[in-house]
């Protein structure tokens, strides 16, 4: 299992998965950026938008792309981030209208949560409904290994 760790986040990836944990660059000295995690069961392109621009159009039906996007401290305590702990996904959470950028055949899932005092959005794009049971199991296995430090 390949390990990733940066910016207070750590996780293990199964064989065949790729991932990056990074922070966007800032243009203003006082600006603070937060962690963005990209994970996939296929090769990730170097150029990626936060929520999958540059990635999802090239996905095949068995592919899955996962984003963990950290929001700032102003989001803590808001109703949107009330869910506590790293979530698990279910097939029922996925739909074509839950995509940031709808593409034929793809399904999306989005869940906001707080883990260890840090607010996140989990965004998952599945390549197709046909592979959804396997995709859900793989994503949950990866999320089970996620360690969020305060």
Regions found by a protein language model. Name each.
Residues 18-137:
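Conserved polar/disulfide-associated segments of primarily extracytoplasmic proteins
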Residues 1-12, 135:
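Short aromatic-glycine motifs in intrinsically disordered, low-complexity regions
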Residues 130-150:
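Short flexible/disordered coil segments
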Residues 8-24, 142-148:
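Short conserved aromatic/hydrophobic patches within beta-strands of well-structured domains
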């Amino acid at each position: 299992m390949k390990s990733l760790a940066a910016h207070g986040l750590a996780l293990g990836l199964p064989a065949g998965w790729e991932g990056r944990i990074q922070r966007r660059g800032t243009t203003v000295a006082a600006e603070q950026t937060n962690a963005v995690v990209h994970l996939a069961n296929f090769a990730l392109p170097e150029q990626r938008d936060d929520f999958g621009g540059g990635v999802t159009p090239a996905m095949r039906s068995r592919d899955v792309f996962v984003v963990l996007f950290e929001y700032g401290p102003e989001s803590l305590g808001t109703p949107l981030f009330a869910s506590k702990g790293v979530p698990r996904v279910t097939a029922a959470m996925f739909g074509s209208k839950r995509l940031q950028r709808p593409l034929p055949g793809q399904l999306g899932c989005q869940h906001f949560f707080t883990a260890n005092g840090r607010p996140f959005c989990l965004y998952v794009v599945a390549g197709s409904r046909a592979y959804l049971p396997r995709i859900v199991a793989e994503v949950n296995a990866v999320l089970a290994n996620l360690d969020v430090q305060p």
